[in-house]
Curated annotation (Swiss-Prot):
A Pfam family hit: cwf21
Region (Disordered): 1-74, 87-107, 123-143
Domain CWF21: start-end pairs: 71-120
Family (UniProt): Belongs to the CWC21 family.
Recorded name of the encoding gene: CWC21
Protein name stated in the entry: Pre-mRNA-splicing factor CWC21
Principal location class: cytoplasm
Length: 143
């Protein structure tokens, strides 16, 4: 072990020889409450890691484009799920009564539903672009 800490050899000690940091020892000064840096390099690395973690949300704009693409994909996927559910139900009706539900009519019904759902989605997106939530406005004004 380095720096004279721990066992020189774990052999015969019935332990692994691993030495843990003592959680009971506090590096705070009793009067001021400030942490004293005994192992300066380690403490400084720890502090810089914390500050880097805090800075990450500011770089969120890089991921914003990806998030928009994923959200749009999920919405379109939900539309396709609804269309496929309609197709399944119409095909079940076709099995019971083939003359009433030919394949062409099923395709037309599915396309009609898809077009109405896509139109609704585009209308919602138009309104979302016109309105910006207060939380976004306050973060943009602080920049």
């Amino acid at each position: 072990m380095g720096r004279g800490v721990g066992l020189q050899s774990a052999k015969g000690s019935s332990t692994s020889g691993y030495v843990q940091r003592s959680l009971a020892h506090d590096n705070r000064d009793d009067k001021t409450g400030i942490v004293r840096l005994k192992n300066k390099n380690y403490e400084l690395r720890k502090i810089t890691k914390r500050s880097q973690k805090v800075d990450k949300p500011a770089n969120e704009s890089k991921d914003n484009g990806l998030k928009k693409v994923l959200v749009e994909h999920d919405k379109r996927r939900e539309i396709e799920v609804q269309v496929s559910e309609l197709r399944d139900s119409l095909e079940d009706k076709q099995d019971r009564n083939p003359d009433e539900w030919p394949d062409k009519r099923i395709d037309e019904e599915c396309e009609k539903l898809r077009s109405t759902l896509l139109a609704d989605l585009q209308e919602k997106e138009k309104y979302q672009k016109a309105y910006t939530p207060r939380s976004k406005r306050s973060s943009e004004s602080s920049k």
